[in-house]
């Protein structure tokens, strides 16, 4: 089995089936959004593994580290040379091979919805749709103040509630899917993980 086939299989195991879409927010939706918001607000830090499918179909894997509010780090395994760090204000995208760094405002990415200090999906008017399948829920949200910045779809296992995957559609319409595994929540993380440093040439 090749590495690429293994990664594809790992991601497929976490991908979710087709969901029926709720026509409008129901009482069940409101309760679930409150439950999801409470779950996310209960996460101070998280670490684990990820498998990513880029907009071009390229598969990558690595480790991620998250500290709310506003901080996340993706360490990609070779051959992907990327390192992505959000420091609460900016997202730094490193190319470790070329030793370059690009910065974009965190607020211009849909990930800010997941990383904000306090999540309130029921009352922020951010949720576009809620979808359900046996044992799974999928919530698609946008920033209501910046609707053109794209969307994030968060996929949760139910009972117990756990974030398993997110799908980001950026403002160019490009889709990136990230599936999570072996997560640990509320662990001690080095603050330096979330420091954007100019690359040394």
What is each model feature region?
Residues 3-7, 11:
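N-terminal export leaders
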Residues 17-20:
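N-terminal signal peptide c-region/cleavage motif recognized by signal peptidases
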Residues 23-31:
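Cleaved targeting-peptide boundary
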Residues 38-55:
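A short, Trp-centered hydrophobic/proline-enriched beta-strand micro-motif
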Residues 40, 108-122:
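Short, solvent-exposed helix-to-loop capping segments enriched in aromatics
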Residues 43-45, 59-61, 67-69, 79, ...:
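Extracytoplasmic
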Residues 63-113, 176-177, 182:
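An acidic-aromatic
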Residues 122-126, 132-201:
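Gly/Pro-enriched, hydrophobic low-complexity segments
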């Amino acid at each position: 089995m090749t590495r690429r086939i293994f990664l594809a299989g790992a991601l497929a195991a976490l991908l979710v089936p087709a969901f029926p879409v709720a026509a409008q927010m129901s009482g069940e939706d409101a309760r679930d959004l409150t439950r999801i918001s409470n779950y996310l607000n209960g996460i101070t830090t998280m670490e684990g593994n990820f498998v990513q499918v880029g907009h071009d179909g390229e598969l990558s894997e690595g480790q991620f580290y998250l500290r709310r509010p506003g901080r996340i780090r993706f360490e990609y395994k070779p051959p992907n040379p990327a390192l992505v760090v959000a420091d609460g204000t900016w997202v730094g995208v490193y190319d470790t091979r070329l030793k370059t760094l690009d910065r974009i405002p965190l607020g211009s990415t849909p990930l800010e919805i997941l990383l904000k200090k306090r999540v309130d999906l029921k009352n922020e008017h951010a949720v576009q749709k809620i979808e359900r399948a046996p044992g799974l829920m999928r919530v698609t949200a946008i920033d209501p103040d910046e609707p053109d910045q794209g969307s994030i779809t968060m996929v949760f296992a139910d009972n117990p509630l756990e974030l398993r995957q997110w799908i980001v559609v950026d403002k160019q319409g490009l889709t990136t899917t990230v599936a999570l595994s072996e997560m640990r929540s509320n662990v001690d993380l080095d603050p330096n993980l979330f420091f954007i440093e100019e690359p040394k040439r």
